[in-house]
Amino acid sequence: MNNTIKTDVLIAGCGCSGLYMAMNLPADKKILMITKSDCESSDSYLAQGGMCMLKCEEDYDSYFEDTMKAGHYENDKKSVEIMIRSSADVVKDLVDCGARFAREADGSLAYTREGAHSSNRIIFHEDITGKEITSHLLEKVRTLPNVTIMEYTRLLDIISRDNRCLGAVIRTGNGEIIKVEASAVVLATGGIGGLYRHSTNFRHLTGDAIAIAIKHGVELKDINYVQIHPTTFYSDKEEDRSFLISESVRGEGAKLYDKNGKRFVNELLPRDLLTEEIRKQMAKDNTDFVWEDLRTIPEEELKTHFPNIVQYCIDKGYDPSKECIPVVPAQHYFMGGIKVDHESRTTMDNLYAIGETACNGVHGRNRLASNSLLESLVFAKRAALDITKNAVVKPTQDEITYFDTFDAEKYADESKIDGEYAELVNKKIEEADKAYEESQKKNYA
């Protein structure tokens, strides 16, 4: 006999998208949030550079064009418009939650710039913007009496009947397997970096929700669109995850050099193009890394804007205020995911997807720097509003019987699930890669 929890909304994931969604749901909705690790171990916490926003109406067209160009014009234009137009309201919400962003002397927001941006439009807090945002969202959500958070609790599967999601199966930190009956299930489990040997992501982010979607026939989109970040700290020692050297340092003037100390590239190229150039240079030089020079940034600014990057490098034996540091590309972000509409609805009834798990097409084939936090927040709020305005459809007797008799104990072997889910995701990405390559051959035949 399986234990059962009943809730209005189940949110699988405690990153910024899951937390912001919980904040924007009505107080009379009972919400259960689960996270595979602790609440602080989401990739939202790791975001360094900042978050884009529409700073003035005059910047709209160039911001839109920068996003489209970086995405190779494969972006969903409506998604891009929604994201940009919603940015100011999101920033206001974050400030109201206590999030602090860098300010000019007159108190106005300070803006920085990153690769492929035509102007400064990125707000930031030192080099830990994601932590600043997500920690304040978490602090707020923990005060909400209608929200329960279960840490070290994994989403094992959803329970569906005739393309309608009825709930989910979860495993708690003490190994208990529980069925969750929910009027709406939200997949916000992050990306797929844990499937890669070298990634900036936490290791436990292995695309569980993507595998579950594949298993249940929920549509995916752009599953092979995986972003490699051009600059992570190079170490010849294996580490849990690659440490990001934020794109903001290049936005502030950092340069890239080959083994002979010669600059070889425009540092503000879009991420995919810069990664390609770095890999070419590494092959040409027969090296495992290239050099990044942060000494072009005034020392005081370097230490105040990027204190954590500076300290990390010092801990690894490099003082970036006095010498170049070794950098190498690593897997960073998943542009593809579970296909959703502009309200974050999947192709299964009562099932939503938000954050890096979802794909609404906003990023196209390559994400513009510092659009990830914004996109996650904007479309999480839209999902919350969609759930709020739609009346709950009570399950049929057939669905109730199916849920009640569903045997969750078949998920007892977690290592088996790990293998099956990783295989599902990797196979689907490989298939999409092959299909893309074939389409390119036809286009250029």
Which role does the model predict for each range below?
Residues 1-7, 24, 39-40, 46-53, ...:
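Glycine- and aromatic-enriched mobile tails/lids
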Residues 9-33:
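N-terminal Rossmann-like FAD-binding beta1-loop-alpha1 element of flavoenzymes
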Residues 37-68, 72, 230, 240-241:
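Conserved N-terminal glycine-rich FAD pyrophosphate-binding loop of Rossmann-like flavoproteins
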Residues 77-88, 121-139, 150, 200-207, ...:
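Short beta-strand to alpha-helix junction loop
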Residues 95-176, 188, 232-236, 256:
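Conserved redox-cofactor binding core of oxidoreductases
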Residues 150-151, 156-165, 170-171, 305-359, ...:
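A glycine-rich dinucleotide-binding beta-alpha-beta segment and adjacent secondary-structure elements
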Residues 184-237, 243, 373, 377:
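Glycine-rich loop(s) and the adjacent beta-strand/alpha-helix scaffold that form part
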Residues 212, 218-318, 386:
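An anion/pyrophosphate-binding glycine-rich loop and adjacent beta-alpha core
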